[in-house]
Amino acid sequence: MDRYFFILTTIDLFVLGFMCLLTRLSESLNKKQKRGFLLAFALIACISVLEVITIVVDGAPPGYRWLNILSNYLGFGLTPAVPLCLVYVLDKKSIIRRIFKAAVCCEGAYLLFLAATLPYGLVFSVSRENLYARGAYFYIYVAMYYAAMLYLMVATVRTAAAFQNRSRMLIYPLTLFLGAETVIQLALPALHVTWLCVTLLSVLYYIYCSEMWNQLDALTGLLNQNRDRKSVV
């Protein structure tokens, strides 16, 4: 299973690297949008590597316990930040909305909470024998993850509505797929498919947003004529 997972992670990292290159070379994205996508892809890659580290060091000699704790902390802590990066991408304007600032503050508070509760093993624990285990309050991580995904879904639907985009309903099956995959991962933690699915969905989300933004005229910022004709028809 470990060898299979390592191969999947290698493929995962290749796809993310390609998406980073594609984002940097894009002529349709502004600097803010490029920054958001690049940060999202980088975070997914980082968390994917952290998951590999946790698998390698779990059950290893106690000298690696600190690495096991650190990798799990960063993995659990940074996960809700991925949807926030994608929300940041949605608005082409440089002004950051208050609700987004509040969401970032919640992420910061969550990181502090996670760090403060490490000695008590509320969300997760690593024994003296260097064995990982979920804590009694593991649901806090799950709640933060789902809350971030819900925020992304709502923000995407609201943005797509402004484009009169008939494909805006596609965000629901994407979110449903990710939610179902997360439930499977929680029920069967040995599968390790979460971040492969997140990578796939981030690529689909990139395509979805690109199609949506391409409906705008580059000069006026309004729906282009071809889109207007289709709306009338």
Task: Indicate residue ranges for each PLM-predicted region.
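Interfacial "cap-and-anchor" motif at the non-cytosolic start of specific transmembrane alpha-helices
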Residues: D2, T159-W213
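Extracellular-loop-to-transmembrane junctions of the mid-late helices
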Residues: D2-D12, F113-Y151, Q185-L191
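Hydrophobic alpha-helical transmembrane segments of multi-pass membrane proteins
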Residues: I7-Y64, N68-C85, K101-G121, I171-L186
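Alpha-helical transmembrane segments in multipass membrane proteins, preferentially the mid-helix core
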Residues: F18-T23, L84-V89, V142-F163
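Transmembrane helix-loop junctions in multipass membrane proteins, especially transporters and channels
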Residues: S28, V56-G63, D91-S94, P119-S127, ...
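Membrane-water interface at transmembrane helix exits
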Residues: L50, T54, V87-D91, I95, ...
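Non-cytosolic membrane-interface motifs at loop->transmembrane helix junctions
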Residues: G63-Y73, S127-F138, T194-V198
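Conserved nucleotide-binding and Mg2+-coordinating catalytic segments in signaling enzymes
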Residues: S210-V233
